[in-house]
Design a protein with these regions (language model features):
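A catalytic-pocket lid/entrance helix-loop region that shapes and gates access to the active site
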Residues: 169-219
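Catalytic active-site module of serine/aspartate enzymes centered on a nucleophile-bearing elbow/loop
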Residues: 325-370
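Conserved acidic catalytic loop of the alpha/beta-hydrolase fold
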Residues: 128-146
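Conserved HGGG/HGGXW glycine-rich cap/lid loop of the alpha/beta-hydrolase fold
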Residues: 56-113
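Conserved alpha/beta-hydrolase "acid-adjacent" motif
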Residues: 308-314
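Short beta-strand/loop motif that positions the catalytic acidic residue
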Residues: 294-295, 301-303
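N-terminal cap/lid segment of alpha/beta-hydrolase-fold proteins
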Residues: 39-60, 272
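Conserved hydrolase catalytic core segment
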Residues: 144-183
Length: 370
């Protein structure tokens, strides 16, 4: 029997989500505004299998599987880069119909070595390394093709992976569309000061005066690798304070990074600035340039109308280049927000419904969830 979202059946959740949305069209773009937020996620679930995978270069990745071992395979790509997977990420998938794989990317979460240890070298942590890691994990688990779910940085990584290995991706489910291009790094670290001037000045003033007119991500990266623990700790706190400023639409949103323990702040700040200082190890414009490789991969892009961390133009340009991708803009969301979650769950349930229908056609005797 198909598991139900918390306190609601699957069909009821879809009906409730639909009733919460006011839909109106502008051209080909459907905008959805949620009157209020209801938790449509599935109940908390624990993994039924975990492990560590040696991927070379001295790195071992933590991975876990939850849900139905015979369900539709899906892999979750977390954000950051460097944030690691969280238990809530498991809850967007129907555990009766999905085989969900989560893993912590290099130097993140429970993978080793961890970036929160200041002596750890990040040189073997690049986008091409992560793409190879995804393939190694897929092969290790004996999965032929899988749905790729990515949020924020996970969108960038998921697109890069899908463009490199389209034959291994059945669908793309992307939330908070981002770009690895340097203009977006410049926007987040400098131009966004027009939106949050007081907070940005504090952020800018966290680096030496001689570096304040240059690449702020690179300047912070240098501070975060300082031999002085006090310098590292202050830089990590300043970076995380700035991240918390712009990732939420709600002015009274509860901070997350800025109140994390110092080692966790250091870990994510080191990895993020390492990537941003190197253009995310991708060519400028690469993901749009190679979007033709996504042909025949269906998917969804869920984006907040007021996402200042990733302006809507990024998702809009991708939607024009990816003909099989559906763009849904959530009117009450920023870079994250509860209004985005029911849209994503609705899509994931549609994908599972299609799989069940296809299997019933080819195997009429099969039962639900097979």
């Amino acid at each position: 029997m198909t598991a139900a979202p918390q306190e609601k059946g699957s069909s009821a959740a879809r009906a409730t989500a639909a009733s919460l949305m006011v839909r109106y069209a502008v051209g080909d773009l459907e905008l959805r505004h949620h009157a209020h937020v209801v938790d449509h996620r599935y109940p908390p679930i624990e993994p039924h299998e975990t492990g560590m995978l040696d991927v070379g270069d001295g790195h071992s990745l933590y991975w876990e599987q939850c849900g139905n071992p015979d369900g539709k395979p899906a892999v979750v790509l977390h954000g950051g880069p460097g944030s690691g997977c969280r238990p809530g990420m498991r809850r967007q998938f129907d555990p009766a119909r999905y085989r969900v794989v989560l893993f912590d990317q290099r130097n993140a979460g429970r993978s080793t070595p961890w970036a929160g240890e200041p002596e750890v070298d990040l040189s073997a942590n690049t986008t091409p390394h992560l793409m190879r890691d995804i393939e190694r994990l897929r092969q290790h688990l004996g999965i032929d093709r899988w749905l790729v779910w990515g949020g924020s940085w996970g969108v960038t990584l998921g697109l890069a992976y899908a463009e490199a290995h389209p034959e291994r991706v059945s669908e793309l489910a992307l939330a908070a569309i981002t770009s690895p291009d340097r203009w977006l790094t410049h926007w987040i670290t400098r131009d966004m000061g027009r939106v949050f001037p007081r907070e940005w000045e504090r952020f800018r003033d966290g680096v030496p005066a001689a570096e304040r007119e240059g690449d702020l991500a690179a300047a912070y990266s240098r501070l975060l690798h300082s031999p002085d623990p006090a310098v590292r700790a202050k830089a990590a706190q300043d970076w995380c304070d700035w991240e918390d400023t712009h990732v939420s639409l709600a002015p009274d949103a509860e901070p997350s990074l800025s109140v994390a323990d110092p080692a966790s702040q250091l870990a994510i700040a080191r990895v993020v600035t390492h990537y941003w200082a190197h253009g995310c190890f991708l060519d400028d414009g690469q993901l749009l340039r190679d979007a033709h490789r996504l042909a025949d991969i269906p998917g969804i892009m869920v984006h907040g109308r007021y996402d200042v961390s990733g302006p809507l133009d990024v998702a809009w340009q991708l939607s024009k280049a990816w003909s099989d991708g559906e763009l849904v803009v959530v009117g009450d969301a920023g870079h994250s927000g509860g209004g985005m979650t029911p849209v994503m769950i609705e899509y994931l349930n549609r994908v599972a419904d299609r799989r069940a229908g296809a299997e019933k056609t080819t195997c009429p005797e099969s039962g639900p969830g097979s």
